[in-house]
Structure formats: structure tokens, C-alpha cells
Regions:
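Amphipathic alpha-helical polymerization modules
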Residues: 1-140, 271-275, 279-377
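Cysteine-poor, low-complexity segments in flexible/peripheral regions
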Residues: 139-284
């Protein structure tokens, strides 16, 4: 009798345990109540959920980057429009029909365009500077309060976007791409001349910077990416304040010139002055105007190239966005397949459990009806 009761109670406990899991599945829609129910399935589900979390984070970053890309595209469109207007003003100024008063009026227009370009050069999106490369929390360009010279404050790096596990791709362009153009190139061992506001880039996109390595207030070498612990290129200072160096890098160097410096030269020429404020002749000014037209066309070409790069890099990011979204969709399907309960099967099992409960309790009742005397007899 005792053995029968123990057996019945054991079966009842198993039944209760299974019934709890069935009810959990029906109420939550989840296939596992505890990881120990099926450790292999549980580990697989955890892997899916971890991947989902990772790709969701990547997708959020890509979505956030959309605003940056859109802002970069819009800023470059405005920059190009302003440069087109400047080129038109140069052409108008360099004609016989435009007198000196008209040229001085154009000089004021050019100064206005310079201010506009300076503002656009420091465009931001969600607090990030569009043209500072990886240093997007720092202002891209500054203007000297005394001379009005505009200089780039960042480096030749690019902002990047996480598009896959451990994979990043470039986004946008930097200030060198947009507001500088190649003014000269120097092959290995060639001698080249440059100014303090020009930027020197090698074939590996490294920047060679004038640096004061001993803190004596005087620049004493061109250092790779501004690293004063590295080997440097020596230079000599020329009478006009420019510098001359010999390319000892073994690579081709590009000397990048700023559109802002060209605008300063252009404004001075329109006012019949040189960079020091000395008076120049109209013939000398005409030569500068012609040179400025060529330089501004080169600058405009760089802007077009930069705009194209923004577009192609944005398209690459969009392609990865579609891939990430597809992965998230597939992961959701997999998680649903492995983590979701089969409600139809559980409903059938619940009915079977109910029938089993009925039969088991019927047995328990019959056993309870048996008295010890009846049992012994």
C-alpha cells in the first residue's frame, strides 16, 4: 500500500513539474523556463541574443551617422555654390569694363564669401564638426583676429562608422580635402618650397608638420604627423618667409594650398595691395587675378572630388545598413524559431496532462477508499 502511494505521489510530482513548464510556455510564449531545461538550446539562444544586441547597436550607430552624412552633403553643396560665385566675380573683375571702384566693390563681395566659407568650414551636426576628421569634437578652422588668416586645426584623419563586427569604414571628408588643393608635388630627393599655412601630405596620407621640438619658440623640422620623437626633414627659411626643404621621405609629397589664402591674395589685389599692404600696379593686380582664377578652379575641383567622396562613402554605409538590417531580421526569425514555444503542441500537451491528472486523481481516490481492513482482507 505504502509503495503504491509513494509511486502515485512520485508520478504526481513529475506531472506537476511538467504542467508548470507547459503553463509557463503558454503564458509567456517561451520554449525554455530555465536554461537547464535544454542547455544546448539555451546557449544557442543566448548566442542569437548577443548577436542581435551587437547588430542593433551597429544599426543605431549607422542611423545616427545619417544626419552627419546629410549635413556634409548639404554643406559641400553650399561651399561649391559659394566658390562658383567667387569664380564669377574674378572673371567680372578681370575685364576692361570693370573700373577700380568696381573691383573694390568686388573685393568686399569676396570678403563676404570668405566669411561664408569660414562658417561652412566649421559646420556641425549634433555637436560634431563635419570637417575635423576623427577629431570631430574640435573646431575645424580658426581665423587670426589680426591678420584674418584662416588655418586648419585638425589632421588628415577621417571619421569612421562601425558597420560590422570589428569593421569600420570612412565617413565624410576632412578640411584638407575640401579647402586645400595640391599646389605642388615633390618626388624623393626633390627640393620644394612651402609656406607655414600649406599642408604637406605623403603617399600614405601622413602629414608632415612644422614643429618646435625643443620648445625654443622656433620651428626646427618637418615631423611625421607632428611626432617630434620621429626623424624630421630639415628646412631653410627664405627671405619672403616661405621655407625650402629636400624630400627625404622616399615618397612623393603633395603640398596643399588653402583656398582661404587665395581669397586673401585676391582681395588684396582687387584693392591694389600686396600681402604686406604695399601698393601694387593694376598690371600686377591683373596677373594676380588671372592666377587666382586658375587657383580657384583647382580649389573647386577639389571640392567636387570631396563631394563625390562623401556620396560614395555614404552609399557604402547605406549598403552595410541594408546588410545589418537583413541580419537583424534573420536573427529575429532564428530566435523566434528556437526561443518561442510551440503553442499548438503545448495546448495538446495541456489537454493530455489534464486527462492524466483526471486518471491519477481517480486512482488516488480509489486508494483512499480502501481501508486498512479491506486492504488486509
Amino acid at each position: 500500500m505504502i509503495s503504491s502511494i509513494d509511486s502515485i505521489m512520485y508520478n504526481l510530482s513529475i506531472l506537476n513539474e511538467r504542467n508548470e513548464k507547459v503553463n509557463y510556455g503558454l503564458s509567456t510564449g517561451e520554449s525554455l523556463q530555465n536554461g537547464s531545461d535544454d542547455s544546448m538550446k539555451f546557449d544557442y539562444i543566448l548566442g542569437i541574443q548577443n548577436d542581435t544586441s551587437m547588430y542593433s547597436s551597429i544599426q543605431e550607430g549607422i542611423n545616427y551617422s545619417d544626419t552627419f552624412s546629410t549635413a556634409s552633403d548639404s554643406a559641400l553643396a553650399e561651399i561649391k555654390t559659394a566658390t562658383e560665385s567667387i569664380i564669377a566675380e574674378i572673371i567680372k573683375a578681370n575685364t576692361d569694363t570693370t573700373n577700380q571702384e568696381g573691383k573694390e566693390s568686388i573685393a568686399l563681395e569676396i570678403e563676404g564669401y570668405k566669411e561664408l566659407l569660414f562658417s561652412l568650414a566649421n559646420s556641425q551636426s549634433n555637436g560634431e564638426y563635419l570637417f575635423s576628421g576623427i577629431n570631430s569634437d574640435s573646431q575645424s578652422f580658426v581665423m587670426d583676429d589680426t591678420t584674418g588668416q584662416v588655418s586648419y586645426q585638425s589632421d588628415n584623419s577621417l571619421k569612421s562608422v562601425n558597420v560590422e563586427e570589428n569593421r569600420y569604414i570612412s565617413q565624410g571628408v576632412n578640411g584638407i580635402d575640401v579647402f586645400y588643393y595640391t599646389n605642388n608635388s615633390a618626388e624623393a630627393t626633390d627640393t620644394f618650397t612651402f609656406t607655414s599655412n600649406e599642408i604637406i601630405i605623403d603617399e600614405d596620407n601622413n602629414q608632415w608638420k612644422l614643429m618646435d621640438s625643443d620648445n625654443d619658440g622656433v620651428d626646427d623640422g618637418l615631423f611625421l604627423n607632428g611626432d617630434i620623437s620621429s626623424s624630421s626633414m630639415s628646412f631653410t627659411t627664405n627671405a619672403d618667409g616661405s621655407f625650402t626643404a629636400t624630400n627625404s621621405t622616399g615618397n612623393t609629397l603633395d603640398i596643399k594650398h588653402s583656398i582661404f589664402d587665395d581669397l586673401d591674395d585676391l582681395t588684396n589685389a582687387l584693392n591694389l595691395e600686396d600681402s604686406s599692404g604695399n601698393t601694387i600696379t593694376s598690371d600686377e593686380a591683373s596677373i594676380i587675378l588671372s592666377d587666382s582664377l586658375d587657383k580657384l578652379n583647382d580649389a573647386y575641383d577639389s571640392q567636387n572630388t570631396s563631394h563625390s567622396l562623401v556620396g560614395s562613402r555614404t552609399n557604402s554605409i547605406d549598403t552595410f545598413s541594408s546588410i545589418v538590417q537583413s541580419k537583424l531580421t534573420n536573427l529575429a526569425i532564428l530566435e523566434n524559431e528556437y526561443a518561442s514555444a510551440d503553442l499548438t503542441a503545448l495546448a495538446v500537451e495541456a489537454q493530455a496532462l489534464e486527462n492524466t491528472y483526471t486518471a491519477l486523481y481517480s486512482t488516488i481516490n480509489r486508494v483512499n477508499d480502501l481501508s486498512l481492513v479491506k486492504y488486509l482482507s
